[in-house]
Amino acid sequence: MAKINWNNERRKLKDLQPWSRNPRQINKAQAARLAESFNEFGQVETIAIGPTNEVYNGHQRLGVLLAKYGGEHEVEVRVASEPLTEKQREKLTVYLHKGAAGEWDFDVLANEFELDELLDWGFEKRDLDIDLWQPEGEASDDAPV
């Protein structure tokens, strides 16, 4: 199979067709944070689609944008030069969302970022080792009494 090329184009939101087998989910709090990021930064990441408008990546962005702007709103999308097979689609989904692009440096997060802001911006307490963030001598809320 030849290398797939991706081109930037514009599409109406109503024309984009979500993948019924998309394994990614978003809860209300995450959707609200995503909407807040659109308000502050605009649509930084595009939605990736196939030649016939099937969504490969960006289902959560699509849902939030539809709720915010409606189906007639146009967005920039990345269009594959050819359709992906189901196996390629599964593989792409995992690659894009499960660490293929790197991991967090928790030392940098702990020393250079504010915990409250990280939690506001989308980290969950379970994602962070909260004990690392406690000043010396201060007990964690989760510590036994």
Language model regions located:
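Aromatic/glycine/proline-enriched transmembrane-helix motif characteristic
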Residues: 1-145
